[in-house]
Amino acid sequence: MVKTQRVVITPGEPAGIGPDLIVQLAQREWPVELVVCADATLLTDRAAMLGLPLTLRPYSPNSPAQPQTAGTLTLLPVALRESVTVGQLAVENGHYVVETLARACDGCLNGEFAALITGPVHKGVINDAGIPFTGHTEFFEERSQAKKVVMMLATEELRVALATTHLPLRDIADAITPALLHEVIAILHHDLRTKFGIAEPRILVCGLNPHAGEGGHMGTEEIDTIIPVLNELREQGMKLNGPLPADTLFQPKYLDNADAVLAMYHDQGLPVLKYQGFGRGVNITLGLPFIRTSVDHGTALELAGRGKADVGSFITALNLAIKMIVNTQ
């Protein structure tokens, strides 16, 4: 790495395990400076609850970034709206969570930070606070004014991107248009090259219907939409294999010769990945003008403050972000 970079982290829901995981991250050295966008008392109280050392250093944007030493974090302060009781949601803190996301996103957009790693949020409490919120992916897409973003989850062995994300099943077929597929595949191909350092990405594409439509007998979306788009993109030089039945595609004979899978909808691709690598998976938002990774689990309110939260996914998310920073330099 040419110079030390700053990575901004949001802990997510303050009553959940996010703050626990941040404190655990701080127990090791990192080659980047970790800037945590959070309430100071929240972090120090959680560290005391876990019996772990933590020193918070003030964020100084005009000073050179320094590698993070064990037991320390750099703090970019955002104040809680309500005091936190571990494991109990407080509606007003939905505003606090969104403030941390907004500040972190803005810092990436203005060049303060080289990447953003997000902890788990509770979508329900944010909406209960009167803030329409469907997820990190959509929030960062809107705030960064990105034309289109793509959700991808990854482990060391498997990357799965989604053509559609948080849609009811009844709406998915109508959402999968030629324009959407062109855009999603272009973003996936571009970011595999630029952020993952893969010179010629090989992408497996799932069909939408059982048996990938069985030649039109189980749905015609493959014939009408997916196959024509793949043929057009192959003519541009992209290495695309599909559409393949999802129950066939996730086998070593296909995956061993691919860099990523494109699933048509959320529950088509993610159950396989989460079964294969739960606790080690990372959520990545492709198409943003900055690097964003996230844990692949929820807030686990029942584990907060008990020292039982597994920091593995957060470590993987941070390590992947660091690799992506190197690839883009």
UniProtKB/Swiss-Prot annotation:
- Known pathway: Cofactor biosynthesis; pyridoxine 5'-phosphate biosynthesis; pyridoxine 5'-phosphate from D-erythrose 4-phosphate: step 4/5
> Could you mention a single GO BP entry for this protein?
pyridoxal phosphate biosynthetic process
Q: Which cofactor does it need?
A: Zn(2+); Mg(2+); Co(2+)
Q: Where does a divalent metal cation bind?
A: 166, 211, 266
> Could you tell me one molecular function GO term of this UniProt entry?
cobalt ion binding
Instruction: Name the Enzyme Commission number(s) assigned to this protein.
Output: 1.1.1.262
Top EC group: oxidoreductase
* Catalytic reactions on record: 4-(phosphooxy)-L-threonine + NAD(+) = 3-amino-2-oxopropyl phosphate + CO2 + NADH
Per the record, what is one GO cellular component? cytoplasm
Additional note from the record: The active site is located at the dimer interface.
Q: Which NCBIfam families match?
A: pdxA
Subunit structure, per the record?
Homodimer.
- What's this protein's name? 4-hydroxythreonine-4-phosphate dehydrogenase
Origin species, per record, is Escherichia coli O6:H1 (strain CFT073 / ATCC 700928 / UPEC)
Instruction: Name the gene that codes for it.
Output: pdxA
